[in-house]
């Protein structure tokens, strides 16, 4: 496997995200995410867009990197942001946001093990709300396609 900068990963090595909040990040890297944010705002125009989904077809395509950095740039611009980790198989966002492992999250809310408010984490220093993936379920695809998922997203939109 290769990382974002073309270096081959060692077996068992965790990938590292390049967060725009890191003062060592090159100016061009940070500006690319700000440009993406601006372009999304421009494309939305007068539409009332409140939800973005970042996904990919295969692992290791940097969807987590894009999701977290786009969330950070949106929050930095004053928008209310809820970053939801729906990778129920191999969640990683909690690691980069220092949210702890096996905390309550999406899977726990959808299986009625906790409320949405109990699972949400306010990351005040980043100006965003984070909903971790939660406990890995045996049926991630089915869990995300149930009606409760849409209800959860609708509730988050109103917060």
Which residues does each predicted region cover?
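P-loop NTP-binding module
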Residues: 1-159
């Amino acid at each position: 496997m290769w990382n974002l900068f073309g270096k081959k990963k060692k077996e068992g090595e965790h990938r590292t995200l390049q967060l725009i909040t890191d003062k060592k990040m090159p100016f061009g890297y940070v500006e690319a995410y700000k440009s993406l944010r601006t372009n999304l705002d421009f494309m939305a125009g007068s539409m009332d867009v409140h939800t973005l989904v970042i996904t990919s077809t295969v692992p290791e395509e940097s969807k987590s990197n894009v999701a977290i950095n786009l969330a950070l740039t949106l929050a930095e611009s004053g928008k209310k942001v809820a970053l939801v980790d729906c990778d129920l198989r191999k969640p990683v966002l909690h690691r980069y946001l220092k949210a702890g492992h096996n905390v309550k999250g999406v899977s726990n809310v959808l299986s009625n093990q906790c409320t949405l408010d109990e699972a949400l984490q306010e990351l005040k220093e980043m100006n965003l709300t984070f909903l971790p993936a939660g406990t890995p379920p045996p049926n991630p695809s089915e869990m995300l396609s149930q009606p409760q998922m849409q209800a959860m997203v609708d509730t988050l939109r109103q917060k």
